[in-house]
Amino acid sequence: MSSAPAPGSAPVCLTLWDEEDFQGRRCRLLSDCANVCERGALRRVRSVKVENGAWVAFEYPDFQGQQFILEKGDYPCWSAWSGSSGHHSNQLLSFRPVLCANHSDSRVTLFEGENFQGCKFELSDDYPSLPSMGWTSKDVGSLKVSSGAWVAYQYPGYRGYQYVLERDRHSGEFRTYSDFGTQAHTGQLQSIRRVQH
């Protein structure tokens, strides 16, 4: 699925290099890429520059494995995109633009249980620690993204596994933690922020 830019905005654009520090062969993406190796341009990705938009990178082809949010800027090596992730990956093989990342109008509702059951809390701002704002469980059973795009993290302080949650994917409804991403083995979410577009 390709995303069309909002009226008046620049089209999404991402440049990849097969060596760290923006060296070696490069490949430019303007839409989804299920496997950068199949394009024939690169065997691996070691550095990334996001020129326009926000992107989700995956460690495996076909949008599988650990997710990494890539917002506008430079990522000269794997530690720049892995950061304090719970999983350090030195390979990125599939990419897609983030849909509907309208930072000024983002809203998500967290639910304690699966299928939108139990205690709930509606958010419209960034929270570096859900427990400190009153969320009593370390887990989120389900959530609804009413507008915008969010990145949720396994631990407080925007650390651990990343889960990119968009209004235009799953109709914004993530009924169980397994809907958060292919690497989600638990519903543990302890910080969340809006995607920077």
From Swiss-Prot:
Record keywords: Eye lens protein, Repeat
GO molecular function, one term: identical protein binding
Disulphide bond pairs: none
Transmembrane portions of the chain: none
GO BP, sorted A to Z: lens development in camera-type eye
PROSITE patterns: CRYSTALLIN_BETA_GAMMA
InterPro entries associated with the record: Beta/Gamma-Crystallin (IPR050252), Beta/gamma_crystallin (IPR001064), G_crystallin-like (IPR011024)
Region annotation (N-terminal arm) ranges: 1-11
Region entry Connecting peptide, spans: 100-105
Entry keyword Transferase: no
Gene3D superfamilies xref list: Crystallins
Residue stretches making up the Beta/gamma crystallin 'Greek key' domain: 12-52, 53-99, 106-147, 148-196
Pfam family, one: Crystall
Function as written in the Swiss-Prot or TrEMBL entry: Crystallins are the dominant structural components of the vertebrate eye lens.
Record note on quaternary structure: Homo/heterodimer, or complexes of higher-order. The structure of beta-crystallin oligomers seems to be stabilized through interactions between the N-terminal arms.
Similarity annotation: Belongs to the beta/gamma-crystallin family.
Domain notes: Has a two-domain beta-structure, folded into four very similar Greek key motifs.
Designated name of the protein: Beta-crystallin A2
Organism: Mus musculus
Taxonomic placement: Eukaryota, Metazoa, Chordata, Craniata, Vertebrata
